[in-house]
């Protein structure tokens, strides 16, 4: 029996689409189409004049999107960091009523051994979101130094055993090249103890390598900055993150644009000094809060456990 790698349960589905506050004639962006769970719900709430622009850099996601036959829907393959260029091409800068980003990796990507994202399935050590370009995890591990690998595991995986893991990978690749996910996972389990029965020892390392290979954090920074320009006044930014590195970027971005700087404590400022502090500082976002999955959703979809949704609204400055 064939395995259905496209089976995917969207996390915080209703909450995310509700946060967008869909207008019947609005123009919306699903910046991480995946398998279209969020897109389909958005389309169900749009009127005949509404539009949904979907983006994904995964060829498999694009193939799935071709199955949506709706004149209000368009899907393109590109990194979401290039979203501003795409919207400029459509002459829609400042016209977007909502942007949805469901960050991280999808269930279909994890479930397909050939993608190389999971330590639970033996497959090629690839890890690229877009399999048509870039360097695979196998190729990078083959050429990276111990210092490079250590930095990646520490910064993108917060892995305490980063140096020992990196040394083991480096020396193993000198003996015989690591080519599969199971080989890499087994090597890591000889170094990292099972301190948490619910968390595989290779979790942090696989996350770190994947983030590095796909330049994920830089992608997030770029798409968030682009959102300010392409959103209409009153437009919503909705972001679902799954680990602290992602959420830290989203939280910082929203707070940066929704809070004025606090004056230094313990120092008396003149009216002019206070005026200078806030000169040319305009709030561009309204922080609308955060939402976590319900206990019921987590029971149905354990993947939702680590999810956190943050949303904001563009202000008229």
Swiss-Prot record:
UniProt-annotated location(s): Cytoplasm
InterPro entries: RsmH, SAM-dep_MeTrfase_MraW_recog, SAM-dependent_MTases_sf
GO molecular function: rRNA (cytosine-N4-)-methyltransferase activity
Enzyme type, top EC level: transferase
GO biological process, any: rRNA base methylation
UniProt keyword annotation of Transferase present: yes
Family: Belongs to the methyltransferase superfamily. RsmH family.
Protein name as annotated: Ribosomal RNA small subunit methyltransferase H
């Amino acid at each position: 029996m064939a395995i259905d790698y496209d089976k995917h349960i969207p996390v915080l589905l209703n909450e995310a689409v509700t946060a967008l506050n869909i207008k019947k004639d609005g123009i919306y962006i699903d910046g991480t189409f995946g398998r279209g769970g969020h897109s389909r719900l958005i389309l169900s709430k749009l009127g005949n004049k509404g539009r949904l622009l979907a983006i994904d850099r995964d060829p498999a996601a694009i193939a799935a999107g071709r199955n949506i036959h709706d004149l209000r829907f368009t899907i393109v393959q590109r990194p979401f960091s290039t979203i501003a260029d795409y919207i400029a091409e459509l002459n829609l800068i400042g016209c977007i009523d909502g942007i949805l980003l469901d960050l991280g990796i999808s269930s279909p990507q994890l479930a397909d051994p050939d993608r190389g994202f999971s330590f639970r399935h033996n497959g090629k050590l690839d890890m690229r979101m877009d399999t048509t370009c870039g360097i695979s995890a196998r190729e990078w591990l083959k050429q990276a130094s111990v210092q490079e690998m250590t930095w990646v595991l520490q910064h993108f995986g917060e892995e305490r055993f980063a140096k020992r893991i990196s040394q083991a990978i480096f020396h193993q690749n000198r003996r015989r090249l690591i080519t599969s996910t199971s080989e890499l996972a087994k090597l890591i389990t000889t170094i990292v103890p099972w301190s948490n029965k619910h968390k595989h020892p290779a979790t942090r390392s696989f996350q770190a390598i994947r983030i590095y290979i796909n330049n994920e954090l830089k992608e997030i920074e770029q798409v968030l900055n682009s959102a300010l320009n392409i959103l209409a006044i009153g437009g919503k930014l909705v972001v679902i993150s799954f680990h602290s590195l992602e959420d830290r970027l989203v939280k910082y971005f929203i707070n940066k644009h929704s809070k004025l700087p606090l004056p230094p404590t313990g120092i008396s400022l003149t009216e002019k000094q206070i005026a200078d502090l806030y000169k040319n500082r305009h709030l561009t976002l309204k922080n609308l809060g955060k939402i976590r999955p319900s206990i019921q959703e987590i029971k149905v979809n354990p993947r939702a456990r680590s999810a956190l949704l943050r949303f904001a609204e563009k202000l008229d400055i």
